[in-house]
């Protein structure tokens, strides 16, 4: 069958077998064909319907042309060339449209499937968005009501979503009723939208004037109890409710009313529990869902002095002041705050519930796809988190001791054998014995000069040595513990010894010759090349030799135990360390306890840096050779050594002359024994043993080069006892951990660079560091190579969907996944969230290398964002009720010095009441909220570091360093910074927010760094003031950057507990009177009447002691270590020129760059030109911690 290609790609069949069929089709007229052709010419493809008509007409034409092939020449002959070309173009367009239709049909089918899938999956997305929207609205409503940014506390709004959630909540309300004044009827209403149904708690009071007491009647539902209240007594009521969901959309709950009767001392704070009455009412009946949103109204008809306190399940803002609101307003405020927190927990439960349902659906891919779309933002958060101090509890307890203690090197004597011929000395191998420690002795054999001259000088060749060792004594996956041992020896300037006394007359006659040479004639007989000269020798017994030695003192001190945390990048906080160690060394065994423990960055001798704890102990042991002990030894060759040996020498030619060579070849090895004795009883030196005189033999080996250039009577072996590097010789001493207990908060990294944090960037070899990073990144790359292309395809597809749809649903879920990442990084994720983040990790890790470049910027951006959004701090995260205590003490106007007294009593009362299991509610509910946990993690150290203002709140060594950036208004834009009182606008929160987002505000910025050293007697607070135009500025020709410091001592009175503050003198701080004058003139221009340096220093100290009300204070940042603070201060202690530019390099840039250095150790921007000084000062600061060891 032949095929002829027509110009519109139509195939005309030319087959003889079909001719009959064609003839049967000749009834089709030419007119019909012409009409179809006309239709094709006129047809314009402008719509889907036209296109369909065109296709159908074309198909008909093809069929007819195949049936009427004999008419084709007639049709073509009637068409012009131009028309034929036009038809060709139409046909080409037709073909193109056909291909497009096929492609679009496939795409439309794909999109239809995707839309169908998304329609199903968006069921969960819409719910999650709805919950987030409610949170945002509730937060705005609360702020609008109280005009106070207190954090993510939300008002409840009835929603179908709430009814779908599984709720497991317990909460309580506490009322304190006192009767110190006359009875006045008062009415307090507390609304809690979480209570189900209407429950009335009535508290009424009746007074018996004759008996002088009062009766309190408490009624709730069918419960009715009465209490007789005597003078100085009061009652506490705890109304608790546990709500949980059951099947069929019904809710059951249990209610408990707990009443405590207490007595009052000086003020109305619980001091002890006198009588306790506990009764409960259990309600099991079903309550319909529609009652969820009803609220409880409690009418209290009680005295005006009654105080109502609600124990919040989460937190109370630190910024709250009792002076802002009155008594009744305060009650309402706490009530709202309480309700907002609880409702927020419900929304969080709902949120996690919807996530888990979405993940359980195998066909649901929407959450993963949305996560990939937001991968860049999530990576940014992850990289930021790796420098955020995410604190986690760390706890270790060892009570039975560590049996496998490590044995370490200790200083020992060794014998250095020298063969001496004339004045030529060849040194052989060294031999050791652990029988004597620290002696420096020398025999009298082969002395070339008189005693007490060169002999004495040789004794003093090595008279002083100090060695520091960091010996590991414990290691696991989290920590490694080192004992810092300092080994030293000192020599007296006199020579001691009770052995043989040498004089000029007997020095050579009584030498202890070890090798006797016989018949050596090498220097008297000329020899030719290759002439063999032989010399024989024999071994002889050495005489008994008395030893001389310096009076020597060997001392070993162990003053510090270093507890180093692995993979931690900031110092730990909330320390509670107890440690007992048993040390056996130098005839001394002692068990010691750690006397003090402080957090610090630790730099080991090998250059590796850790963050950890330095523990102080005190151990010292000595041994002294004082001349009262006599040491003797003899040398004796073993009997298996032949009597005579032969040395061979070959002549050689040099310079045209035949000269003889020395016998310097290793000819033989000789074994000999050394008998050592010590005139004393056997005793322990650590785990070593001292032997009695001549009690044992020590095997040694002599391999020496014998010089026989000429015969001489001055031959033999000089045997020297000396002290060598302790690393070469092992001696057993032990440090055993008897008991170890560590409780603290440990800073962990949430990023992907944990392996890098153990390096000291200033000290480690940069090539090795780069290699380690490269290996790590290659590992990531190898694991993700096969996934990266797929991830890119998915991201591209999602982006196309975003571009093609008019919706905000994709972008609105960013916060959702950020919260998930944060929750997982903090370790509080549920199983569902864990699965989700596992799916996310492919997208996150595949872009890790690119995202690393944004770490520095991410730190500040995320740190500020979180700190600003969540102004919530946990004063004591492991102590229930600490915030309530703070508010109580403020409410009752307790004096500052007495806070700790009532603090202890209140805590005791809480502990006694923990039997009802409601005291732990706050801990359980707090763990459900990832935002709160992140805020707590970032601001934890901030809370502790702020205690320097009020040291009575300090509960240990968790006081940390902080830095804050303050702002003053400028006199004129573009001029040098001059301080003035800022306007109200400058102090406004809105302006402050704008100021933190930009670096070009009309304000001068400077830094105040506060470092607190918690000592046993007092707290030493050091403030560093740093910035452009700060410090000792004496000229205005150039802009400079400088720093200075002030110090304060906070002391607590042992009996009154009142705290006093004193200023360190300028002399103790390290300044001169002239420097004080420069500083004073800088900050007190108008106080020219004060010229005394002491008075000037006191005014400067007062100015910077606390926050200045005339400045805008930014959010404080907590510093992981104080070493970079010291480096920054030292670098700018002497003012340095600063190339000031208002737009690109101003005072605010300098502060931000300095902050980046303090927090991250990254030098950029305005600090680059000072990088060498900062690095040097930083290393010196690290080394400084070890200098006192």
Curated annotation (Swiss-Prot):
Q: Name one GO molecular function term.
A: peptidase activity
Domain named PPPDE: residues = 981-1187
Judging by the UniProt lineage, the source's domain of life is Viruses
Q: Which residues form the active site?
A: 1004, 1147
Transmembrane recorded as keyword: no
Keyword annotations for this protein, in alphabetical order, are: Capsid protein, Outer capsid protein, Virion
Q: Where in the cell is it found?
A: Virion
Gene Ontology cellular-component terms listed = viral outer capsid
Name-wise, this protein is: Putative structural protein VP1
| Organism whose genome encodes this protein | Aedes pseudoscutellaris reovirus (isolate France) (ApRV)
């Amino acid at each position: 069958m032949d095929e002829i290609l027509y110009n519109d790609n139509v195939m005309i069949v030319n087959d003889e077998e079909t001719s009959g069929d064609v003839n049967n089709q000749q009834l089709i007229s030419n007119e019909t064909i012409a009409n179809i052709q006309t239709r094709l010419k006129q047809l314009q493809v402008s719509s889907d319907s036209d296109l369909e008509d065109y296709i159908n007409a074309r198909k008909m034409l093809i069929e007819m042309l195949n049936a009427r092939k004999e008419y084709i020449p007639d049709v073509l002959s009637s068409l012009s060339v131009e028309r034929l070309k036009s038809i060709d173009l139409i046909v080409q367009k037709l073909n193109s449209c056909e291909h497009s239709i096929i492609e679009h049909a496939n795409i439309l089918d794909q999109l239809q499937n995707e839309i169908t899938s998304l329609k199903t999956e968006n069921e969960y997305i819409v719910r999650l968005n709805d919950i987030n929207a409610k949170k945002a609205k509730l937060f705005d409503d609360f702020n609008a009501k109280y005009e106070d940014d207190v954090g993510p506390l939300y008002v409840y709004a009835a929603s179908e979503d709430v009814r779908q959630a599984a709720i497991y909540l317990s909460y309580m309300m506490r009322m304190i009723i006192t009767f110190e004044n006359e009875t006045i009827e008062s009415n307090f209403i507390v609304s809690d939208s979480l209570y189900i149904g209407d429950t009335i708690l009535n508290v009424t009071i009746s007074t018996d004037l004759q008996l002088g007491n009062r009766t309190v009647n408490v009624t709730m539902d069918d419960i009715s109890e009465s209490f007789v209240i005597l003078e100085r007594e009061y009652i506490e009521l705890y109304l608790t409710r546990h709500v949980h969901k059951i099947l069929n959309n019904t809710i059951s709950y249990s209610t408990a009313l707990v009443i405590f009767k207490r007595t009052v001392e000086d003020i109305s704070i619980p001091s002890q529990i006198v009588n306790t009455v506990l009764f409960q009412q259990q309600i099991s009946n079903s309550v319909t869902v529609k009652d969820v949103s009803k609220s409880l109204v409690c009418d209290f008809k009680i005295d005006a002095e009654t105080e109502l306190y609600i124990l919040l399940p989460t937190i109370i803002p630190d910024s709250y002041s009792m002076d802002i609101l009155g008594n009744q307003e305060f009650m309402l405020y706490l009530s709202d705050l309480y309700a907002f927190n609880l409702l927020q927990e419900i929304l969080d439960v709902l949120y996690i519930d919807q996530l888990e349902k979405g993940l359980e659906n195998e066909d649901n891919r929407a959450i993963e796809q949305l996560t990939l779309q937001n991968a860049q933002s999530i990576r940014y958060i992850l990289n930021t988190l790796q420098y955020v101090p995410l604190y986690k509890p760390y706890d270790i307890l060892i009570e039975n001791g560590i049996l496998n203690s490590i044995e370490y090197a200790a200083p020992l004597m060794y014998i250095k054998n020298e063969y001496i011929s004339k004045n030529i000395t060849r040194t052989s191998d060294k031999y050791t014995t652990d029988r004597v420690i620290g002696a420096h002795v020398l025999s009298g054999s082969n002395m070339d000069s008189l005693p007490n001259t060169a002999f004495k000088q040789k004794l003093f060749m090595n008279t002083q040595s100090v060695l520091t060792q960091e010996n590991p004594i414990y290691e696991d996956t989290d920590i490694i513990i080192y004992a810092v041992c300092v080994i030293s020896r000192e020599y007296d300037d006199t020579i001691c010894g009770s052995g043989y006394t040498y004089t000029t007359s007997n020095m050579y006659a009584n030498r202890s010759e070890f090798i006797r040479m016989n018949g050596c004639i090498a220097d008297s007989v000329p020899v030719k090349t290759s002439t063999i000269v032989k010399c024989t020798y024999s071994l002889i017994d050495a005489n008994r030799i008395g030893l001389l030695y310096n009076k020597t003192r060997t001392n070993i001190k162990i003053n510090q135990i270093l507890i180093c945390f692995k993979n931690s990048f900031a110092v730990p906080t909330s320390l509670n360390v107890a440690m007992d160690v048993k040390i056996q060394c130098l005839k001394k065994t002692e068990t010691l306890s750690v006397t003090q423990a402080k957090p610090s960055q630790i730099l080991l001798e090998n250059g590796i840096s850790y963050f950890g704890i330095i523990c102080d102990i005190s151990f010292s042991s000595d041994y002294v050779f004082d001349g009262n002990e006599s040491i003797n030894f003899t040398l004796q060759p073993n009997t298996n050594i032949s009597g005579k040996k032969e040395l061979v020498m070959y002549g050689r030619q040099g310079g045209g002359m035949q000269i003889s060579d020395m016998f310097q070849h290793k000819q033989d090895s000789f074994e000999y024994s050394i008998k050592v004795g010590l005139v004393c009883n056997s005793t322990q030196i650590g785990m070593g043993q001292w032997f009695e005189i001549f009690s044992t033999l020590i095997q040694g080996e002599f391999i020496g080069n014998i010089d026989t250039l000429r015969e001489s009577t001055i031959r033999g072996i000089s045997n020297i006892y000396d002290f060598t590097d302790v690393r070469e010789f092992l001696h057993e001493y032990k440090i055993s951990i008897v008991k170890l207990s560590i409780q603290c908060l440990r800073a962990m990294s949430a990023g992907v660079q944990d392996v890098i944090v153990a390096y000291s960037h200033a000290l480690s070899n940069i090539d090795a560091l780069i290699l380690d990073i490269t290996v790590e990144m290659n590992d990531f790359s190898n694991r993700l190579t096969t996934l990266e292309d797929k991830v890119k395809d998915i991201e591209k597809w999602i982006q196309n969907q975003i571009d093609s749809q008019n919706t905000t649903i994709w972008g609105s879920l960013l916060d959702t996944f950020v919260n998930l990442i944060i929750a997982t990084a903090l370790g509080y994720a549920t199983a569902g969230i864990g699965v989700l983040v596992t799916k996310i990790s492919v997208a996150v890790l595949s872009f890790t290398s690119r995202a690393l470049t944004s770490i520095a910027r991410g730190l500040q951006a995320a740190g500020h964002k979180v700190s600003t959004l969540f102004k919530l701090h946990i004063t004591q995260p492991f102590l229930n009720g600490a915030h309530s205590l703070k508010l109580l003490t403020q409410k009752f106007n307790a004096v500052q010095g007495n806070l700790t007294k009532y603090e202890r009593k209140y805590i005791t009362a809480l502990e006694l009441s923990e039997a009802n299991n409601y005291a732990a509610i706050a801990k359980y509910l707090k763990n459900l909220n990832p935002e709160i946990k992140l805020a707590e993690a970032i601001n934890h150290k901030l809370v502790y570091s702020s205690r320097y203002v009020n040291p009575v709140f300090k509960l240990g060594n968790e006081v940390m360093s902080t830095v804050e950036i303050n702002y003053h208004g400028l006199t004129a834009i573009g001029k040098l910074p001059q301080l003035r009182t800022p306007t109200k606008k400058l102090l406004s929160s809105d302006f402050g927010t704008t100021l933190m987002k930009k670096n070009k505000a009309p304000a001068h910025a400077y830094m105040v760094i506060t470092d607190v050293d918690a000592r046993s007697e007092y707290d030493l607070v050091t403030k560093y003031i740093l910035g452009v135009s700060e410090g000792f500025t004496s000229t205005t020709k150039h802009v400079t950057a400088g720093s200075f410091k002030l110090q304060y001592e906070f002391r607590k009175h042992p009996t009154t507990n009142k705290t006093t503050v004193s200023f360190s003198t300028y002399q103790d701080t390290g300044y001169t009177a002239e420097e004080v004058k420069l500083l004073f003139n800088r900050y007190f221009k108008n106080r020219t009447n004060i010229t005394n340096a002491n008075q000037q220093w006191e005014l400067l100290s007062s100015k910077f002691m606390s926050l200045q009300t005339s400045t805008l204070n930014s959010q404080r940042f907590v510093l992981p270590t104080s070493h970079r603070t010291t480096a920054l201060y030292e670098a700018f202690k002497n003012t340095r020129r600063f190339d000031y530019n208002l737009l690109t390099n101003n005072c605010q840039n300098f502060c931000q760059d300095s902050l980046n250095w303090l927090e991250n150790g990254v030098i950029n921007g305005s600090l680059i030109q000072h990088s060498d000084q900062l690095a040097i000062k930083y290393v010196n600061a690290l080394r400084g911690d070890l200098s006192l060891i």
